[in-house]
Amino acid sequence: KNTDDGAKIYTPLTLKLYDWWVLGVSNRLAWGCPTKEHLLPHFLEHLGNNHLDIGVGTGFYLTHVPESSLISLMDLNEASLNAASTRAGESKIKHKISHDVFEPYPAALHGQFDSISMFYLLHCLPGNISTKSCVIRNAAQDLTDDGTLYGATILGDGVVHNSFGQKMMRIYNQKGIFSNTKDSEEGLTHILSEHFENVKTKVQGTV
C-alpha cells in the first residue's frame, strides 16, 4: 500500500456523493459522530486566521469559515483540491498544494500557519498509527509557535463498532481506502505527544 491508495477513491463522481455518504450517512450511523453536531463545531472552534487544511475532501467544512479567513489546501488528489477550492470560494484560497504528507513540506511553509486541520486523513494513510508519526511531525513544522494542529480520525482499536461500522471497516481496509484496524486513542495520543507539549483527545462514537 502507498499513500495514493487512500486518495484514489476521491474522483469527481465520488466527491459528489461524499457529503451524503460520508458526512451524512456514515458519520451518524456507522461511526456515531454526526457531522453537524460534533465535527463541524470542532473544526470551527480551533480555526485560526491563516489556516492549512490537509486532506480536503469536498471542502464542506471550509464553506463555514469566516470570509476573512486565509485558507491553504493540501492534498495528494488534484480532484479534491479543485473541488474544495471551488466550493470554499477561490477568494479565500491562498495556496493549493499537491503533496504527499509523508514527505517534508516545502521550506517556504514552515512556521506559517495559525492552525492546521486533518479531518479524516490519518485513517486513510497506509501503515499503523506509529508509522504516521512523521505526518504529525511534518505538519507541526508548518505551525507558528502557538499554532494548533487538530482533526478527527476513525479508530479501529479500543472502540466498539456497531454492525454497520464493522462492515464498513472490513470493506474499506480490504480495499486500502482505510488502514486503521489497529489505530487507537492511546496510539494517537502517543504520536501527538512526540511533537506537541499540549495534547488533548476525545472519542465520540468511534471517532
Regions found by a protein language model. Give the residues of each.
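Short glycine-dipeptide loop
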Residues: 143-149
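A conserved beta-strand element that flanks and buttresses the S-adenosyl-L-methionine
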Residues: 117-120
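Class I SAM-dependent methyltransferase SAM/SAH-binding core
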Residues: 50-105
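Conserved class I S-adenosyl-L-methionine
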Residues: 1-47, 60
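A short, conserved alpha-helix within the catalytic core of class I
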Residues: 125-138
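Local beta-strand N-terminus motif with an aromatic residue
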Residues: 48, 93, 112-114
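C-terminal alpha-helical "lid/dimerization" subdomain adjacent to the S-adenosyl-L-methionine
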Residues: 150-201
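Short hydrophobic/aromatic beta-strand or adjacent loop that forms the aromatic wall/cage
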Residues: 205-207
